[in-house]
C-alpha cells in the first residue's frame, strides 16, 4: 500500500513539473516579450535592414535606443510590454523585452488578439492592417513607411513566439 501511494505521489509530481515546464507564455505578457527578444535577434530583416536604413540610429534626443510598446486592445487590464532596440555592431539588436520601463516609447502599437494572430501568420501586412484600422499605431509614420519590409517582419515576429492566447495575463 505504501509503495502504491509513493508511486502515485511521484507520478503527480512528475506530471505537475512537466506541465509547468512546457507552458507557453501568455501572448504579449512580459514573459512573451522576453522570448520575443530572441525572435527579433534571429531575424535578419529586423536586425540588418533596420540598421542599414538608419532606423536604429535615429533615436529621440540622441538617447541611443528605440522603444516599441505593444499591447492587446481586447485585454484592457493587461500590461503593455516594450522591446528596446539598440544599434550594436552594425545591427539593430533587441536588448530588452518585458514590462514597460520607458515612459517615452518611439512607437505604440495595439490591436485585438485575433488581429495580432492574423498578422503574425502573414494573412496581411502593415499597410492593410493600418488602412483598415486592424492595427492602431502611434509614432513617426513616415519613418515606419520607409521601413515597410522590417515593419512586416515585426508583425510576423508576433507569430513566431509560441504563445498562449487563451487568457489576457
Model-derived regions, located:
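Positively charged n-region of N-terminal signal peptides that target proteins for export
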Residues: 1-4
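Bacterial N-terminal signal peptides
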Residues: 7-15
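Feature captures hydrophobic
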Residues: 20-169
Amino acid at each position: 500500500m505504501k509503495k502504491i501511494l509513493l508511486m502515485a505521489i511521484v507520478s503527480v509530481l512528475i506530471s505537475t513539473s512537466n506541465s509547468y515546464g512546457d507552458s507557453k507564455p501568455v501572448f504579449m505578457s512580459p514573459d512573451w516579450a522576453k522570448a520575443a527578444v530572441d525572435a527579433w535577434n534571429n531575424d535578419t530583416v529586423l536586425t540588418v535592414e533596420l540598421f542599414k536604413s538608419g532606423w536604429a540610429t535615429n533615436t529621440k534626443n540622441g538617447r541611443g535606443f528605440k522603444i516599441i510598446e505593444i499591447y492587446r486592445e481586447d485585454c484592457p487590464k493587461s500590461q503593455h510590454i516594450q522591446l528596446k532596440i539598440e544599434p550594436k555592431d552594425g545591427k539593430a539588436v533587441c536588448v530588452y523585452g518585458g514590462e514597460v520601463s520607458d515612459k517615452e516609447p518611439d512607437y505604440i502599437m495595439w490591436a485585438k488578439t485575433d488581429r495580432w494572430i492574423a498578422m503574425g501568420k502573414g494573412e496581411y501586412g502593415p499597410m492593410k492592417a493600418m488602412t483598415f484600422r486592424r492595427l492602431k499605431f502611434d509614432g513617426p509614420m513616415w519613418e515606419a513607411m520607409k521601413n515597410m519590409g522590417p515593419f512586416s517582419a515585426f508583425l510576423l515576429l508576433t507569430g513566431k513566439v509560441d504563445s498562449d492566447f487563451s487568457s489576457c495575463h
